[in-house]
From Swiss-Prot:
Keywords: Amidation, Amphibian defense peptide, Antimicrobial, Cleavage on pair of basic residues, Secreted. This is Cruzioseptin-4. The lineage of its organism: Eukaryota, Metazoa, Chordata, Craniata, Vertebrata. It is found in: Secreted. One of its GO terms (cellular component) is extracellular region.
Length: 28
């Protein structure tokens, strides 16, 4: 199950990066 949690963390970080990118694109 630890591997599963690692996947969740990885996906979460990726999602955060995408959201931040979209927000930055929207502001400019």
């Amino acid at each position: 199950k630890r591997g599963f949690l690692d996947v969740i963390k990885h996906v979460g970080k990726a999602a955060l990066s995408v959201v931040s990118h979209l927000i930055n694109e929207g502001e400019h």
